[in-house]
UniProtKB/Swiss-Prot annotation:
Keywords: Cell cycle, Cell division, GTP-binding, Magnesium, Metal-binding, Nucleotide-binding, Septation. The keyword Cell division applies. GTP binds at residues 36-43, 63-67, 81-84, 148-151, 180-182. The gene is engB. This is Probable GTP-binding protein EngB.
Length: 199
């Protein structure tokens, strides 16, 4: 997709929720997956960059997304919201099922163009954040790291926090790193630039 203006980002809707590949949409539209810890702000990220308040439901209860949620954007692109990882109150068997479902999607879906890996800028990445980044690099899946909740940190400390995150991830300089805030609407254009570069 060459130009951002050809995509009406406000023309977006939730398409379907899927537990396995038999439920995936059967076409060749490009897909961007969104992965991150429970409550890292994935739903807020989706709502903010699409300019919609409640398209993706935000929840104060972590672990709410238990299926792959497919969002249709102007019939030209899809976002795929992946279940949040690292939520302790989910049973081991449920976590194993989610892991299997996520791995199947990420490694076998031809439509997948890139993964937006969301991390919390306030904290060093968790073990699961690092595992996800390593997994994507191992399978050579393009990754865009989006560091959320920047509004919770004074701007003068962003660089320091960014350095901590990058060091922990062993961040590849050829990947894109975006500082993001849904509250202050920071990083929206950079996110779209990075996404559209992949599709």
């Amino acid at each position: 997709m060459a130009e951002e203006q050809v995509l009406n980002t406000h023309n977006a809707s939730i398409l379907l929720s899927a537990a396995n590949k038999s439920h995936y949409p059967q076409d060749d539209l490009p897909e961007i997956a969104l992965a991150g810890r429970s409550n890292v702000g994935k739903s807020s990220f989706i709502n903010t960059i699409l300019g919609r308040k409640n398209l993706a439901r935000t929840s104060s209860k972590p672990g709410k997304t238990q299926l792959l949620n497919f969002f249709n954007i102007d019939d030209k692109l899809r976002f795929v919201d992946v279940p949040g990882y690292g939520y302790a109150k989910v049973s081991k068997s449920e976590r194993a099922e989610w892991g299997k479902m996520i791995e199947e999607y990420l490694t076998s879906r031809d439509n997948l163009r890139a993964v937006v890996s969301l991390v919390d800028l306030r904290h060093a990445p968790s073990k699961e954040d690092i595992q996800m980044y390593d997994f994507l690099k191992y399978y050579d899946i393009p990754v865009i790291v989006v560091a959320t909740k920047a509004d919770k940190i004074p701007r003068g400390k962003w660089n320091k926090h960014e350095s901590v995150v990058k060091k922990a991830l062993n961040f590849d300089k050829s990947d894109t790193f975006i500082v993001f805030s849904s509250v202050e609407r920071i990083g929206i254009d950079d996110s779209w630039d990075a996404i559209l570069e992949q599709v």
